[in-house]
Design a protein with these regions (language model features):
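Conserved catalytic cores of very large enzyme subunits
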Residues: 1-37, 54-281
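Secondary-structure-rich domain cores
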Residues: 45-52
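Short amphipathic alpha-helical heptad-repeat segments
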Residues: 38-45
């Protein structure tokens, strides 16, 4: 959670200072930025919790309890995990102006365990949990990014088995019933993916619910291995954006510009009438 990231950064700063104090200016700026950023996030969560505590809404106690947990640690329930993802998205997109091009690291994998725990503990019933997932998906349909908000499902476990589970089908069923096309869903599949996990999205596509991209795990993992990356490191790569892929916590890619390869030709044919020289092109 946000709290854990800040505490880990504090620990690493202390460890670094003990080894080679004083910190360099760049190191100090790095640790200071984490402290400032995550302390601000935790203050925001605290303020939201205080508002929930004085709200008369029937939903307020659940919201307050969720935010109280995120103030001090990692999420433990399905609702808390969804809230963490949503807060991260809103802070990145609306405060940092930084696009969030996925939701979680395989949403079905991220939600399967807390869903089962919530059911077995009696904390929430199945309908409530389905509603949480549905409302979560509807947030991004309402935001309506014209390029779509990606999330991915599926993948491959470390032992080579299919990572899909009952939560995969549950998310697809909820998405299907809502009849939305945003978020757009990426399906990580491989030759050993059981048919039921592919038949569901294919059936949806035939009925016009077609906001899907299929990503072949084997080919992508092989492309990593061809560059010297081990299977153990590559098997849980992330999918983001349209259908780009990246080693989890191992890449930082950017797309800051569009290159118009036709422009120099057009300018040359136009005889550079605006006064530009070849060198300035």
């Amino acid at each position: 959670g946000f709290y854990g990231i800040r505490e880990r950064a504090r620990y690493m700063r202390t460890k670094r200072e003990r080894r080679s104090y004083p910190l360099t200016p760049s190191e100090r700026a790095y640790f200071d930025s984490i402290e400032i950023e995550y302390s601000a996030i935790l203050r925001l969560i605290h303020r939201l919790r205080e508002l929930a505590e004085i709200s008369e809404s029937d939903k307020a106690p659940t919201i307050s309890s969720c935010l109280a947990r995120l103030e001090v640690g990692a999420p433990t329930t399905l609702y808390e995990r969804l809230m963490l993802i949503y807060l991260y998205f809103m802070l990145s997109e609306s405060v940092d102006s930084y696009q969030v091009r996925s939701l979680g690291s395989g949403l079905d994998h991220d939600l399967a365990e807390p869903f089962a725990n919530d059911l077995s503990s009696g904390r929430f019933n199945e309908n409530q949990l389905d509603d949480f997932i549905g409302y979560f998906l509807m947030q991004f349909s309402a935001i309506g990014n014209y390029w779509g908000q990606p999330l991915y499902l599926g993948g491959t476990n470390l032992d080579g088995s299919c990572r899909m589970n009952d939560m995969t089908l549950r998310i697809l069923d909820i998405y299907d019933n809502l009849g939305i096309y945003n978020p757009k869903i990426q399906i990580k599949y491989s030759p050993n993916t059981p048919d039921k996990y592919l038949e569901k999205p294919l059936d949806m596509i035939r009925r016009g619910h077609s906001s899907f991209v299929f990503v072949c795990d084997d080919n992508i993992i092989d492309s990593f291995r061809a560059r010297g990356v081990s299977f153990e490191r590559a098997h849980d790569y992330d999918v983001k954006g349209c259908y780009e892929f990246a080693l989890r916590a191992g890449e930082f890619s950017t797309a800051p510009i569009y290159i118009n390869l036709l422009a120099p030709i057009l300018r040359a044919l136009d005889d550079c009438s605006d006064g530009d020289s070849f060198e300035t092109l």
